[in-house]
Amino acid sequence: MGIRGLAKLIEEVAPAAVSKRLIQHYCNKVIAIDASVMLYQFITTITSGDGTALANSSGEVTSHLVGLLAKVIRLAEAGIKPIFVFDGKPPEDKQGELEKRRQAREAAELEQQKAEEEGNLERAKQLSRRTVKVTQQHCKQAERLLDTLGIPYVVAAGEAEAQCVAMAKERVCEGVASSDLDVLAFGSPCLIRNLAQGGDREIVEINLNTVLKELGFSYDEFLDLCILCGCDYANSLEGIGPKTAYKLIVKHRSIEEVLAADQGKLAEKALNWPYVRARELFKNPAVIDPKEIKKTLKWKPVNRGEAMQFLVEEMEFDRETTEKKLDKLVAARKKPKQCTIDSFFSPRSSNPEVTKTKVKQ
């Protein structure tokens, strides 16, 4: 779910924090990429004519590998050094959200079957995307492909987003690429959306310190805004959308004060609402020490033999097409990169600061 409505809210009340970038802006930079979200996007968007994911003759899904190979090539062509980060074990507090997602997938599967029986193929195609789940097998296959391509990856202790952010705070990387606004709630100094997506989609960068400055919020106040909007660890309260949440935090500065000022109405709705635990999970998530990750971080040459064995012999990719793609990747890595001037500047301060600027009304 991410943070409900946060992207649109930031565009409206803190537009200076949002920048449109060319991919060349990230030349020579190390970027942590939320791999779990990325694989889901590949499986739901790289599809056959009927809307189902690409698969080999054994029925094994291959869309995630097609997408991952293409993304690695595009990043290499732009001179970007990626670190892919996969989800580890989700916190127990997220089980409710995961159960809701499971139920939603099952409901979508039933609707899809009904649409197919009624001959409504377009509706069935739309519903097929809602039935997708990224499995451990998908992740292991992606990790194996990255191994053959010489690209480093990390399996997080918990949430991939939290691990990415911990790495950004310790300057192991210079930004976090994800579509999920949770990254800002975890405190990432820089969120990059649509990185190397292909097509005409603009890369959007959101700078957290600028968000805080524009809003006149401390990080703690911003985090309370995120929780009040609704997140994976705590659903939003009935009747409170992103704009209302923003106005309440502007006025009261914390969730406790919001509840206390409402003469018991919200407090009643908030009974058993785990906002305190949500704060703890965002501020102190389970992560691997970024300093330990940095010690072993290495980009290696492509192992063409292993890549061909996996993609062509095992996953049934077309041999000629795969050879050409690997040639393209090797050439991209060797070619000197033309970087934009601003790509050489250091990233801004990695820790959100308490700001004292005037609050926007």
Curated annotation (Swiss-Prot):
Binding site for DNA: 159, 230, 232
A GO biological-process term: base-excision repair
Region (I-domain): 123-252
Region of interest: Disordered: 341-361
Gene Ontology cellular component terms for the protein in this record: mitochondrion; nucleolus; nucleoplasm
Pfam families from the UniProt entry: XPG_I, XPG_N
GO molecular function terms noted in the UniProt entry: 5'-3' exonuclease activity; 5'-flap endonuclease activity; DNA binding; magnesium ion binding
The EC number(s) this enzyme carries: 3.1.-.-
UniProt cofactor(s): Mg(2+)
Free-text cofactor note: Binds 2 magnesium ions per subunit. They probably participate in the reaction catalyzed by the enzyme. May bind an additional third magnesium ion after substrate binding.
Compositional bias of kind Polar residues: 341-354
Keyword DNA damage appears in the UniProt entry: yes
Keywords assigned by UniProt, alphabetized: DNA damage, DNA repair, DNA replication, Endonuclease, Exonuclease, Hydrolase, Magnesium, Metal-binding, Mitochondrion, Nuclease, Nucleus, Phosphoprotein
Subcellular location: Nucleus, Nucleolus; Nucleus, Nucleoplasm; Mitochondrion
Residues the entry annotates as binding Mg(2+) 1: 34, 87, 159, 161
Region (N-domain): 1-105
Keyword set includes Ribonucleoprotein: no
Broad EC category: hydrolase
HAMAP family xref list: Fen
Subunit and partners: Interacts with PCNA. Three molecules of FEN1 bind to one PCNA trimer with each molecule binding to one PCNA monomer. PCNA stimulates the nuclease activity without altering cleavage specificity.
Family membership noted in the UniProt record: Belongs to the XPG/RAD2 endonuclease family. FEN1 subfamily.
Function: Structure-specific nuclease with 5'-flap endonuclease and 5'-3' exonuclease activities involved in DNA replication and repair. During DNA replication, cleaves the 5'-overhanging flap structure that is generated by displacement synthesis when DNA polymerase encounters the 5'-end of a downstream Okazaki fragment. It enters the flap from the 5'-end and then tracks to cleave the flap base, leaving a nick for ligation. Also involved in the long patch base excision repair (LP-BER) pathway, by cleaving within the apurinic/apyrimidinic (AP) site-terminated flap.
Cross-referenced PANTHER family: FLAP ENDONUCLEASE 1 (PTHR11081:SF9), FLAP ENDONUCLEASE FAMILY MEMBER (PTHR11081)
Name of the protein described by the UniProt record: Flap endonuclease 1
Gene: FEN1
